[in-house]
From Swiss-Prot:
Its main location: membrane. It comes from the Eukaryota. ATP binds at residues 854-861. Keywords: ATP-binding, Membrane, Nucleotide-binding, Repeat, Transmembrane, Transmembrane helix, Transport. Residues 130-383, 818-1062 form the ABC transporter domain. The keyword Amino-acid biosynthesis does not apply. GO terms for biological process: aggregation involved in sorocarp development; sorocarp morphogenesis. This is ABC transporter G family member 19. It is a multi-pass membrane protein.
């Protein structure tokens, strides 16, 4: 038997294959126009046959070989039919007794109830207050907002193997219908009605998750993975069990991988990273194809595609639809799709069409009958208008055309259309057809075969009731590989992390270098071990944003039934282990031996093993809070409270005996405490510490010699007459644990890690914070419109009509002639450079609209980036002129650029975003009222008047405006600026036909008013294409195919191609699709003509070059003197005010962030205050005061992590605004610093009042109390500004989290507490200690608190020793007189008994801080220095914002 080998292959362009309608024996499911398709090369047919056989669960390799032999006579036949190929493969499956999973869908009386717009308003800082007050108002307890029907009484069906096209304007409920059909029911108030899948009810269908999938409009992928890695992972998770006999999984995956990449034309991008809006990778169209390919890998029986052609050019979209058609026909795959701007070529591929308006079904039936249905209602279709555009346009009064004689008789509102449909004969026929289909289902019972096939696909170790194809172990393995690939794909962050750790290890090692083995090194050695735990804990902070960043991808892939969410966490654990081991080893190999810890291999590895456990536990603790929290800020603040508690109750700053009962339980629930005990036991267990020179009593001047028999070490664990202290005795008496418990403590530490793993798995399985892809809008209070209301619809239609009628009166543009010549753009790639634009030239004039077209990846967006001066990477060559002059500093300001990615600040409303653009970008001479009036006009024209007071929000949280509405807002933001030149990158992508028509008509008016503009457009209908005057057509590689006039009826354009042998363009054909087909655009398009070379030799190019030279020489026809060109429209002071006002609004509307800071400070204050409850005047209490202040230091450091995500997010929005010259870098930098000041002051005040009195720090000296509060506020301001400065220079949040610990080391290690100043190595003490702001904070606040503190030791605080001279009448003070440099005092333990003496280390607090070289007199100097450091941080923020002001693109 012949063995097949896998070779690479690709599909040819889809054409010339007759597609027949599936024989359903009814009048539904009729395909309109036939189309044809060329096959792949016959030499690769063996591989493709095997793929199909696998997809159909064929296990007959012999039969497949025979079938291949039968087809060998076609080897040189280029017309080998792909359809025939699929049909033959289907026969292979049937011949082996297997059947495809044939599952149709039947929907009856489906009603979906959503949250009304008035049910929730935009949250702000007043919202929680009013909610609390409402608890005391019984009248509000039963108040509920309104609901509305997103879908109302929908009844339709789609047979197995059928293709249903769902049409409707944005907001009509198309996406909701697709979600419900794919059985995604979360986030809706109520779902009524029935949906059955081949007779299986929706409730039972949950067991077959992954057999009906929803592919969302947005593209969500890991940006650092390549295409190959993304799809290979999906294939590993969806590899079926019933493959061909003896076929390896790897071979199976590779065959499908090659097939799908060939089908969608991304073979050459296989090793390109996916990228996103911030990371360069695939183009938008290529990323969309990857999304479709990933969905196909799932091999679902029912697939719902939501606007999946967004970003694809017309030819690629058609190729994609044809592939879907063939798979539906031959493999009985059921497809439901919702497309915006579908061409007739795509429309005709579908069996049935459903038209939805405002949640009402207004037509369902055969696609070839829909147009006539609406014509019979009284509507007329314009020539060359596509059928989908006509079907969605009839509901819009501004677009529809009423046939003569039907005036006043046609439906006007969505309710009228629904009533007309329900009264039609087609509706009754549809109901009968649905009943007949359901009877057929009852007879044939396709669910039986379906269930058997689903079970057969599952691996042997997968439960037959599981929704997953592969086993849990297989999922984990695939996820482990993917996790490593993700990490390796971001080498910068990985390298930065390890470099940071390695660098910090030397800092740690040098400051604690060669620790003393005498009694002076006892406490320092413990502090060293405590600090290494703290350092590794802070490194784990980066896990929090990573947890939130992967939620969208997890939700999508889980809906595809690729893997269990808990499997992802197990894979993360496996990934963590080697990375953590490397991190800990790099740190430990340096610090362990530089510290001078015990040179014992066993102890070194226990040290490493314990640190690994502590790091793993902390990492999973951070993830746990992320998985249990809906918001990053909530989890960040809660986690910071826990970190402070964990540090406090580690057992070092406050030993176990000093803990109060109300919080002491946390000591036992704290993994840090077990790690600390393990490290201490490991190091101290068999060490002894000498105190020969420091034993009590002693004479520093060496005059008095004491008998060693009566001397004792001044340390816990000491015994009379023994001048050494046992390490094990020391830790037992100081910290109340035994060194023998080392193994137990390590074991418990790892048990905490396991517990956090279990809790994470539980949270990931049962908590979904993404909203399931469903989003809802929130409005300002009282501004919510009525949803799906007839009167509201009429009102909105009238607004649009009025706006259209007064457009000419409003638009007054001032444009110029913009030319570009010989534009070349190259980017560095591995092994050299890549040319993306090749000698592109052209112009745009006032009054002209130029279309920029080409297949996906041809360089359209790249050209616009170059022309709009947005490129900051690569090399640009060529010349650009405006009115014959080189471009000046104001070019970006006077041009508008509608970018492909919709980047908006989520904390603003739609109206606020537009007004902000108008205020800062229109000329300052324009009155504010006029600017706002123009904003309202644009809102009306963009059909967004009802959205004016809606929060923009984010798609990830499910709160905010939709994808389509964001696109309209992107356009509106540029239009309100009244630019002189307008660049638009796919302005109609993702919009429905009517919205696209309105936008194109609007920019046509702009052009007619004198604005020159160029617009990339992927899928223009004939009607849209007619609005353009000229076209620049690009081929792959950025080569020019044509630049010139389109001509009336596109005759000038089409005649150019006809002149070189292309077939004539018919009257009914879309010219845009015609030229793309002619030039070989699309997934597998090709052309026999080298059009770029043809253009170079054409007379049209020579004429273009002559005119370009004339235009550059001519210059402007008239000039206006507007003074010196200005980079920004408004002065800096005005920009600063407006930016500050905007940030204030955003902060005001983010209670999670703002109140989170307040709560974090308050809770930290209460925890610390009650932990160090009512400190007295004992020696140990004085030490507790110092540690209380030290933990205040840590609070400020943790605040740094809170500001990171907010600053980095706002900086991304700033970069987008700066590129369009909204405002300069200085207003942003100074405003984002200023907006944090009141939050810091309030937070610090809360902390002060919650901790100062509870800890017993209050004194009768008001100046001291005030000073504590003042320097605390300054320190917190320093920390926040420090975090902002680091954020400003970081490329992403992960890098910022990596840099922060490196810098924090210098702050808390050199503050004078962890290591006293005299013990800091000379190298560091000479500069770092004096440049450390925390040193001045600690000196100022410690001297302030301890200045008036008198120390009175308790019996436990005294170092007890015997006075042998007591019998001779010598008192304790006489026996041991205190002389410098010793501090403290001596007294009898029991009054009247001078034989038992006690030594107290300090007399007062001043003696303590004098040993550190600190002075109370320096407190105001320290405060002034801290102010200087804060100002320095602000200058660094400003500097770094300036350096990074331009995005990398």
């Amino acid at each position: 038997m012949k063995e097949f080998e896998l070779n690479e292959y690709s599909f040819q362009e889809v054409e010339n294959l007759n597609i027949n309608t599936p024989n359903n024996n009814n009048n539904f499911g009729v395909v309109g126009d036939d189309f044809q398709l060329n096959s792949p090369d016959i030499q690769n047919s063996e591989n493709q046959f095997k793929y199909i056989a696998n997809e159909l669960e064929t296990d007959s390799k012999q039969y497949l070989s025979n079938l291949d032999a039968e087809n060998n006579h076609n080897e040189n036949d280029e017309d080998f039919k792909l359809r025939k190929y699929f049909e033959n493969s289907q026969r292979v499956a049937l011949g082996n007794g297997q059947k495809p999973k044939k599952m149709g869908v039947s929907v009856r009386n489906l009603t979906v109830v959503g949250v009304g717009a008035d049910q929730s308003v935009i949250s702000d800082l007043s919202t929680p207050i009013f909610k609390i007050l409402n608890l005391f108002k019984p009248s509000t307890w039963k108040e509920k907002g309104s609901t509305f029907d997103i879908l109302h009484d929908i009844t339709l069906f789609n047979r197995d193997g059928g293709m249903l096209l769902v049409l409707g304007r944005p907001g009509s409920g198309c996406s909701t219908l697709l979600r419900l059909i794919s059985n995604q029911r979360g986030s809706y108030v109520e779902v009524k009605g029935d949906i059955t899948y081949g007779g299986i009810p929706a409730k039972e269908w949950k067991r077959y998750q992954g057999e009906s999938i929803y592919t969302p409009e947005e593209d969500t992928h890991h940006p650092t993975l390549t295409v190959r890695q993304t799809l290979d992972f999906a294939l590993k998770c969806k590899t079926i069990h019933n493959r061909l006999p003896d076929e390896k999984k790897r071979t199976y995956r590779k065959r499908i991988f090659d097939l799908l990449l060939g089908m969608f034309g991304i073979v050459h991008q296989a090793d390109t990273i996916v990228g996103n809006e911030f990371i360069r990778g695939l183009s938008g169209g290529e990323r969309k194809r990857l999304t479709i390919t990933e969905a196909m890998v799932s091999s679902a029986s029912i697939t719902c595609y939501d606007c999946s052609t967004r970003g694809l050019d017309a030819a690629s979209a058609l190729d994609y639809a044809k592939s879907i058609r063939i798979m539906s026909d031959t493999l009985d795959k059921t497809t439901i799709a919702s497309f915006y701007q579908a061409s007739d070529s795509i429309y005709n591929l579908f069996d049935n069409v459903a038209v939805i308006e405002k949640g009402r079904l207004i037509y369902f039936g055969p696609g070839n009958k829909a147009k006539q249905y609406f014509i019979d209602l009284g509507f007329d279709c314009e020539p060359r208008k596509s059928t989908p555009d006509f079907l969605t346009g009839v509901t819009n009064p501004q677009e529809r055309i009423i046939r003569q004689g039907f005036e006043g008789r046609v439906p006007e509102t969505f309710a009228d259309f629904e009533a007309a449909w329900r009264n039609s004969s087609m509706y009754r026929d549809m109901l009968e057809e649905q009943k007949e289909y359901e009877r057929k289902i009852e007879i044939e019972q396709p669910a039986v075969d379906f269930i058997q096939e689903v079970k057969a696909e599952k691996s042997k170790t997968t439960s037959k009731r599981s929704i997953y194809t592969t086993s849990f172990l297989t999922q984990v393995k695939a996820l482990i590989v993917r996790n490593f690939q993700i990490i390796w794909g971001d080498k910068l962050s990985l390298g930065s992390r390890y470099l940071s750790v390695f660098t910090q290890s030397f800092v740690y090692g040098s400051i604690f270098y060669n620790l003393e083995t005498n009694i002076n090194g006892l406490f320092t050695r413990g502090g060293t071990l405590f600090s290494v735990i703290l350092f590794n804990a802070l490194l784990c902070e980066c896990e929090m944003p990573l947890t939130f960043g992967q939620r969208g991808i997890l939700q999508k892939q889980h809906s595809y039934a690729m893997y269990r969410p808990s499997a992802l966490h197990i894979a993360q654990i496996v990934t963590d282990i080697p990375l953590t081991i490397i991190q800990v080893f790099l740190f430990s190999i340096v610090v362990y031996f530089m510290f001078g810890l015990q040179y014992d291999a066993g102890k070194f590895f226990i040290f490493c093993f314990t640190l690994v456990g502590a790091t793993l536990a902390t990492t999973n603790l951070f993830r746990m809070f992320g998985n249990f929290s809906p918001s990053l800020y909530i989890s960040q603040n809660v986690m910071n409270i826990f970190i402070i508690s964990m540090i406090t109750y580690t057992g070092y700053t406050i030993p176990k005996p000093k803990m109060h009962p109300w919080f002491s339980w946390f000591y036992w629930c704290n993994p840090f405490s077990y790690a600390f005990k393990a490290l201490m036991a490991n190091e101290f267990g068999d060490l002894s510490f000498d105190c020969q020179d420091t034993a009590i009593p002693s004479d520093p001047n060496k005059i008095i010699v004491y008998d060693n028999s009566y001397r004792i070490c001044a340390s816990p664990g000491a015994s009379m007459g023994n001048l050494t202290v046992s390490g094990s005795k020391y830790i037992e008496e100081s910290f109340h644990f035994r060194s023998d418990d080392l193994t137990q403590n390590v074991f418990i530490l790892y048990l905490w890690w396991i517990l956090y793993i279990v809790l994470n798995m539980f949270a990931m399985e049962y908590f979904d914070w993404t909203g399931g892809g469903y989003s809802h809008k929130v409005y300002k209070k009282g501004k919510a419109p009525k949803m799906n209301d007839v009167e509201e619809e009429k009102k909105q239609n009238q607004i649009v009509a009025n706006a259209t009628s007064k457009m000419k009166d409003t638009l007054k543009m001032r444009g110029g002639i913009f030319t570009w010549q010989n534009i070349n753009y190259t980017v560095p790639v591995k092994g050299g450079k890549r040319l993306l634009l090749d000698n592109v030239e052209g112009w745009i004039k006032p009054g002209q609209m130029t279309a920029l077209m080409g297949s996906s990846g041809a360089g359209k967006t790249t050209l616009l980036d170059v022309l709009a001066k947005r490129k900051t990477m690569g090399e640009v060559q060529g010349k650009c002129f405006l009115n014959g002059k080189p471009l000046e500093i104001d070019f970006e300001r006077i041009t508008g650029y509608v970018e492909q990615m919709d980047v908006h600040n989520p904390g603003l409303t739609v109206r606020e975003a537009l007004r902000f653009s108008a205020k800062l970008r229109q000329e300052p001479s324009v009155l504010l009222e006029e600017k706002f009036d123009y904003v309202e006009h644009v809102l009306e024209m963009m059909e967004m008047k009802h959205l004016g007071d809606a929060l923009i929000g984010t798609l990830e949280t499910g709160v905010g405006i939709s994808v389509e509405e964001r696109k309209r807002l992107t356009i509106g933001v540029e239009l309100v600026a009244k630019p002189h030149i307008l660049f638009l990158d796919e302005p109609t992508s993702g919009l429905d036909a009517q919205s696209s028509y309105n936008i194109v008509k609007f920019i046509r008016k702009l052009a007619d008013a004198g604005m020159p503009l160029v617009c990339t457009i992927h899928q223009p209908s004939s009607v849209l294409f007619e609005h353009f005057d000229r076209i620049l057509l690009l081929a792959k590689g950025g080569k020019t195919v044509y630049f010139g006039d389109i001509g009336e009826g596109s005759k000038t354009l089409t005649s150019y191609f006809e002149r070189y042998g292309v077939r004539p363009c018919t009257e009914s054909e879309n010219p845009a699709e015609y030229i793309l087909e002619a030039t070989g655009a699309g997934v597998h398009g090709k052309s026999d003509v080298n059009w770029s070379e043809t253009w170079k030799q054409s007379p049209e190019l020579q004429e273009i070059e002559r005119e370009l030279a004339a235009l550059e020489a001519q210059g402007p026809s008239s000039t206006e003197d507007h003074g010196k060109p200005r980079e920004f429209a408004t002065p800096i002071w005005y920009q600063t005010i407006e930016v500050y006002k905007r940030l204030n609004i955003i902060w005001w509307r983010d209670p999670f962030y703002t109140y989170g800071s307040f709560i974090q400070a308050s809770m930290a204050g209460l925890i610390m205050g009650f932990t160090f409850w009512s400190l007295k005047g004992s020696s140990s209490d004085m030490s507790q005061r110092v540690f209380f202040i030290f933990e205040t230091l840590i609070l400020g450091i943790l605040l740094i992590f809170v500001v990171l995500p907010q600053f980095i997010m706002q900086q991304e929005y700033f970069k987008r605004d700066f590129a369009s010259k909204f405002y300069s870098w200085f207003p942003f930098a100074i405003s984002i610093v200023a907006v944090e000041i009141p939050i810091v002051i309030i937070s610090g005040t809360f902390f002060f009042f919650c901790s100062f009195w509870t800890a017993g720090l209050y004194t009768k000296f008001n100046e001291i109390n005030f000073y504590f509060w003042f320097i605390l506020i300054l320190y917190l301001l320093f920390c926040v500004s420090f975090g902002q400065a680091v954020s400003a220079i970081s490329f992403n949040l992960f890098l910022a989290h990596t840099l922060i610990p490196l810098l924090i080391v210098f702050l808390f290690l050199f503050c004078g507490v962890m290591v006293i100043p005299s013990s800091i190595p000379t190298f560091w003490r000479g500069w770092v200690y004096h440049l450390n702001p925390c040193r001045y904070f600690m000196e100022g606040i410690v001297t302030n608190v301890l200045k008036h503190t008198d120390v009175k030791c308790t019996s436990e605080d005294f170092t007890h020793f015997t006075n042998p001279e007591a019998v001779n009448g010598v008192t304790c003070k006489q026996y041991f007189p205190i002389s410098e440099p010793l501090t403290g005092y001596v007294e009898a333990i029991n009054e009247g008994d001078e034989s038992k003496c006690g030594y107290c280390l300090y007399n007062n607090g001043e003696e303590y801080y004098n040993t550190l070289g600190w002075s109370f007199d320096n407190r105001w100097r320290n405060l002034a220095i801290l102010i200087c450091f804060w100002i320095f941080n602000i200058l660094m923020v400003i500097t770094f914002v300036y350096i990074t002001r331009k995005p990398r693109r």
